[in-house]
Amino acid sequence: DQISQTFKDLSEKLNLSNTDFIRTTEQRHIKTVQYLWNELEKNGDIYLSNYTGWYSVSDEAFYNNNEIEEVDGKKIAISSKSSVEWIEEESYFFRLSKWEKPLLDFYESNPSFISPESRKNEVISFVKSGLKDLSVSRKTFSWGIQVPNNKNHVIYVWLDALTNYLSALNYPETKDRLFKKFWPASIHLIGKDILRFHAIYWPAFLLAAKIDLPKKVYGHGWILSGEEKMSKS
């Protein structure tokens, strides 16, 4: 509540306005996330297994071995320099590997989908290196949106958070005025550190759920302070 109010206060000081302010704790969002989960599961794109690997709490992201380095005896993510921990737990997975070719085909058919060109090349290179199925639930904490029909699992934050683009437009009510007017989105303007989530994972979720993709994803750089990013996104 405190952090949410801080954003509202800052917007007022900067004389910024918005037509809606959505929080992922709202019932309309929870309803949309669980509906999307059920659609993905119904289509065979979610299954239960076990996850073993590196996870960064601060980045809220999973990392492969080639994305990790050791500095002063501690394991960190190469891209963000955030500490990572080794976890082993039961998890639901999204069949991301299934969507490797459809994603590459989509990028080729829609060359302006990712901008600038350097970001597009990063994404295509990452996808071509081979996509592994993505862990989309956690058991080690209780806060978050519960997996439908399994109270022991909480939905992974990025599947949850990305869905706010749809819940703000009252999805799955596709005939709703807001959804018809604003989806597909003209552009997702995001920081380069969350490009993978918006240009790979999010499009794969949407393709699997048979939902139109946004028209463009633009990954901008960071404002630096002492050669480190000031903003998370």
Predicted regions and their residues:
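N-terminal, helix-rich and Lys/Arg-enriched segments in bacterial and organellar proteins
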Residues: F7, L16, L40, G73, ...
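Short secondary-structure junction motifs
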Residues: N18, Y51, D212-P214
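Short, polar/flexible loop-turn hinges at active-site or ligand-entry regions and domain interfaces
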Residues: N43-S49, S109-I114
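Low-complexity, flexible helical/coil segments
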Residues: D9-L14, Y55, K192-I200
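N-terminal Rossmann-like or analogous alpha/beta NTP/dinucleotide-binding catalytic cores
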Residues: D1-L48, F205
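Structured secondary-structure scaffolds
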Residues: R23, R28-T32, L36, S79-S233
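Short, flexible segments with low predicted structural confidence
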Residues: S11-E12, K74-K75, R177
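Cys/His-rich short segments
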Residues: G44-E100, L104
